[in-house]
Amino acid sequence: MAGWAGFELSALNPLRTLWLALAAAFLFALLLQLAPARLLPSCALFQDLLRYGKTKQSGSRRPAVCRAFDVPKRYFSHFYVISVVWNGSLLWLLSQSLFLGAPFPNWLSALLRTLGATQFQALEMESKASRMPAAELALSAFLVLVFLWVHSLRRLFECFYVSVFSNAAIHVVQYCFGLVYYVLVGLTVLSQVPMDDKNVYVLGKNLLIQARWFHILGMVMFFWSSAHQYKCHVILSNLRRNKKGVVIHCQHRIPFGDWFEYVSSANYLAELMIYISMAVTFGLHNLTWWLVVTYVFSSQALSAFFNHKFYRSTFVSYPKHRKAFLPFLF
């Protein structure tokens, strides 16, 4: 009974509950969109909170009260500025702790304890044999935090030097959520590091010898997925540029090439694969991170559904074999 009680307590920590709630909310919203039209909520605000960019423009004329809360879609770059700074800081603190034995600041330890207290275990209760998985988990969290920072840095670069933003908008609620999102993701990664009070279990000198097959596979998958996402964003950008790379319009065109041959939102599919690569890096059995992946799947699938609907209603010649998000399936 004590074992089950401990499992239930760890399974219901605030962090997992939050990601589960977000995943369930977006999955429910997706199922509503797939339901018959008569079952869809008629509230304009509900639809406005779900859509952004071109899918927001493609609907019927939006009420003035909705337009009053518009934020330019180009403000996406703000999300990645915050992520680079915040998650870069978390990566620095984790590196200091792993390689120099420096404790986390009091405020960070308190925050992590609040979000996921199950990571704090008494060292005296751990046998020498059981510290090996803890060391592997520490390496996993370190690598995933590196991946998250690299991903954010690349996306920030793309916002400034690759993407061509139109005058499309996002809702201010979506904007505020985006500002908080990468802060929460970084804390989620850090909360998986095995710790005793403020000190990380494993020092860096023993960290690299903990590398396992899933660390290597996760790294390969991450860079493979990132390369495809970058290529997809270049394809989308080139639709608005001439052969010299000069922006000539901000209209929408049908993308071709790479994963766009299979799905309408290839960049969203790549985003999902990036998060799955992080789940692999965690050893495929980290429940908290799989809840994050479930949220990413639900939110990206919803956006992909709207994109697919936009393309099919806008372009008569749109390829009929393409799916919205998952090749050959959805």
UniProtKB/Swiss-Prot annotation:
InterPro entries: 3-oxo-5_a-steroid_4-DH_C (IPR001104), Dfg10/SRD5A3 (IPR039698). It is a multi-pass membrane protein. GO terms for biological process: dolichol biosynthetic process; dolichol metabolic process; dolichol-linked oligosaccharide biosynthetic process; polyprenol catabolic process. Its EC number is 1.3.1.94, 1.3.1.22. Keywords: Endoplasmic reticulum, Lipid metabolism, Membrane, NADP, Oxidoreductase, Transmembrane, Transmembrane helix. Disruption phenotype: Death by 12.5 dpc. At 10.5 dpc, embryos are smaller and fail to undergo axial rotation observed at 8.5 dpc in wild-types and present dilated hearts and open neural tubes. It catalyses: a di-trans,poly-cis-dolichal + NADP(+) = a di-trans,poly-cis-polyprenal + NADPH + H(+); a 3-oxo-5alpha-steroid + NADP(+) = a 3-oxo-Delta(4)-steroid + NADPH + H(+); androst-4-ene-3,17-dione + NADPH + H(+) = 5alpha-androstan-3,17-dione + NADP(+); 17beta-hydroxy-5alpha-androstan-3-one + NADP(+) = testosterone + NADPH + H(+). Pfam families: Steroid_dh. Pathway: Protein modification; protein glycosylation. It is found in: Endoplasmic reticulum membrane. GO terms for cellular component: endoplasmic reticulum; endoplasmic reticulum membrane. Plays a key role in early steps of protein N-linked glycosylation by being involved in the conversion of polyprenol into dolichol. Acts as a polyprenal reductase that mediates the reduction of polyprenal into dolichal in a NADP-dependent mechanism. Dolichols are required for the synthesis of dolichol-linked monosaccharides and the oligosaccharide precursor used for N-glycosylation. Also able to convert testosterone (T) into 5-alpha-dihydrotestosterone (DHT). PANTHER family: DFG10 PROTEIN, POLYPRENOL REDUCTASE. Belongs to the steroid 5-alpha reductase family. Polyprenal reductase subfamily. This is Polyprenal reductase. It comes from Mus musculus (Mouse).
